[in-house]
């Protein structure tokens, strides 16, 4: 199994599909990486030489924020919004939808399970 950015990528899959197992690399980025390194998109990971895997690893390290770094950057951006006290930061702080969705009904994913209110039965 090849390790790229700390992730064991599957060897039986095609290279662009296997690269999407790394957080921060989607289909478009994976295809761009293959093109930049000069690897055919129809090849499978187990057909790659060690030099090709190393070239992919170096290209990703140089040009992409992936895995822990990407998660840390996202969390720092959210923390910055919360510290600023802007509207988006307040919505994050209160665990409510941030992008303008309605909350009178719905928004259960963000708000969590419904809380029972005493004296509501009749």
UniProtKB/Swiss-Prot annotation:
| Residues in coiled coil | none
**Keywords from the UniProt entry:** Ribonucleoprotein, Ribosomal protein, RNA-binding, rRNA-binding, tRNA-binding
User: Which Cys residues form disulphide pairs?
Assistant: none
Q: What PROSITE patterns does this protein's entry cite? A: RIBOSOMAL_S13_1, RIBOSOMAL_S13_2
Could you tell me which Pfam families the record lists for this protein?
Ribosomal_S13
- Any one of the GO BP annotations: translation
Q: Which GO terms describe its cellular component?
A: cytosol; small ribosomal subunit
Q: Where is this region: Disordered?
A: 98-122
The similarity annotation says: Belongs to the universal ribosomal protein uS13 family.
Describe the subunit structure: Part of the 30S ribosomal subunit. Forms a loose heterodimer with protein S19. Forms two bridges to the 50S subunit in the 70S ribosome.
Can you say what this protein is called?
Small ribosomal subunit protein uS13
Q: Which organism's genome codes for this protein?
A: Jannaschia sp. (strain CCS1)
């Amino acid at each position: 199994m090849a390790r790229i950015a700390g992730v064991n990528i599957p060897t039986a899959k095609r290279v662009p599909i296997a690269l999407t197992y790394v957080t921060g690399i989607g289909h478009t980025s994976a295809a761009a990486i293959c093109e930049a390194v000069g690897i055919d998109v129809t090849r499978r990971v187990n057909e790659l030489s060690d030099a090709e895997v190393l070239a992919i690893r170096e290209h990703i390290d140089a040009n992409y924020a992936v895995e822990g770094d990407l998660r840390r950057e996202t969390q720092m951006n959210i923390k910055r919004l919360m510290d600023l006290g802007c509207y988006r930061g307040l919505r994050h702080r209160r665990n409510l939808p941030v992008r303008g969705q309605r909350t009178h009904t719905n928004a259960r994913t963000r708000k969590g399970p419904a809380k029972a209110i005493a004296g509501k039965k009749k």
